[in-house]
Amino acid sequence: QIQNNVIHQAYLNDVEKLLFLGSTCIYPKNAPQPMPEDCLLTDTLEYTNEPYAIAKIAGIKMCESYNLQYGTNFISVMPTNLYGPNDNFDLEKSHVLPALIRKIHCAKLLNEKKYDEVVKDLSLNSIEEAKAYLAKFGVDESKVEIWGTGKPRREFLYSEDMADACVFLLE
């Protein structure tokens, strides 16, 4: 509902250009890799993302319809996986890149025997507790286990580069 209101108010208030941020989850679950833009709406969405994806698709289509019907200049952009300042690096809840960065950082500290820094970084009480915790995520002083099959292709974009791209598109 919020995006509908924003898009409609942009039209009513003669906004010169509107940038709508979509999401890569709008593409089908079994889209080919690398993913071409034109595969939108060609197959089933990932079930766990479906409500969010449908809402994003509705926003994209609403912008497209306003452009056709009213001559607006509403553009849609689908950013890829973003990372950067203020990201979530929690090993239990973060996305793939922040988790990988944190795992490598902790493994490096372990390898360099900087145990106080590891304990502090993880907000735990002892190095034994920290090592046991990190082991759950495949991290020790000699290796970092990277989860998954290695088959999915992923793209990452630094958040400040995305911000620059948005400004560029609006100019």
Residue ranges with predicted function:
Residues 51, 55-58:
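Active-site helix of classical SDR
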Residues 4-50, 75, 88:
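Conserved Rossmann-fold NAD(P)-dependent oxidoreductase catalytic core, especially the SDR/UDP-sugar
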